[in-house]
Amino acid sequence: MKQIVANQKVKIPEGLTVHVKSRLVTVKGPRGVLKRNFKHLAVDIRMVNPRVLKVEKWFGSKKELAAVRTVCSHVENMIKGVTKGFQYKMRSVYAHFPINCVTTEGNSVIEIRNFLGEKYIRRVKMAPGVTVVNSPKQKDELIIEGNSLEDVSSSAALIQQSTTVKNKDIRKFLDGLYVSEKTTVEVDEI
């Protein structure tokens, strides 16, 4: 039997404003503004009241109905981003040649030097709105921060992929920069 309608609601916390205009969702919060375009999905996105966003799909296939929850998850990540922010921690792993990481251009570009003893300098540019710094507390650790989860995670992925070992047995040569922790910038007090 075909499902007639699938709908989900997202509760919006106090202190945030969410605008929806033709499937373009804008979330404003204390850490900034995030916009996301959902025009590629044929779903209804509307504000029921200033504190509730409703996403629904009528007479959809299984895949189209699944997109309803996906949109809600993206909006929840945007809400989390403008309230708490996202933070990824990366550690450099090396057996012999110590990897040297230097941030330049206002913490938006990272230069990776001495990877496997190579002279080549790897430069990785962060996504807009993402900063990278060397951790003051922990040796060989990078901290990547930003409001957009997609931008922070893709920047971390670019750093990790820039230090892939070529033409060697990757089980033996484990050198590189790897994500060690995923958290928010502002941590909840327990």
UniProtKB/Swiss-Prot annotation:
Disulfide bonds: none annotated. One of its GO terms (biological process) is cytoplasmic translation. Keywords: Ribonucleoprotein, Ribosomal protein. The keyword Ribosomal protein applies. One of its GO terms (molecular function) is structural constituent of ribosome. It holds the Pfam family Ribosomal_L6. Belongs to the universal ribosomal protein uL6 family. This is Large ribosomal subunit protein uL6. It comes from Spodoptera frugiperda (Fall armyworm). The gene is RpL9.
